[in-house]
Amino acid sequence: MNIMKKSFLGAVLSLGLLSAAHADVYKFDNTHTNAVFNIDHFQTSTNHGGFYAISGELKYQPEKQDAEMRVTIPVSALNTGVDAFDNHIRSSDILDAEKYPEIVFKSTKWHFEDNKPVSIDGLLTMKGVTKPVTLTTTKFGCYMSPIFKAQVCGGDFVTQIDRTQWGGDYLVDMGMTKVVDIKIQAEAVKQ
């Protein structure tokens, strides 16, 4: 009887591993993937910038409402449209790109409604600090790309972070906000 239970358990576990191994793998298309941030500048105007050379991988199984994602953002890819401002944000005052050249997001749980993701919980690592973040989905879909001749899935996501949780306290003591709004546009191509 014990042997039968162990055999059954082994078969069930094998099926679970097999289905996880068959998740469709997608690579992010960096021409359609970016992360843009907005931060209030002393209650006068809003500073904008973004990262445009994002790479990563998505494992997606919509029928099982399951997905995994890992995204890497090189700090060197920062672009505000003003070189001097880019260099200041990359400096040790703010992101310290020399010491921490990458920002990484790794999903921990996807939440679905009607087979579409509505939010993604994950861990954001920035300046050597890892904290939980939730991305809210504002749009998501998949289509057959006429360019890649493959399925592409992607969407728009938003979140808000307190930058001081990652050691980003530059000018907070002088009244600049801690809150950073982040908008992400992402598309990934099935491999």
Language model features with spans:
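Hydrophobic membrane-targeting and insertion signals
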Residues: 2, 20-23
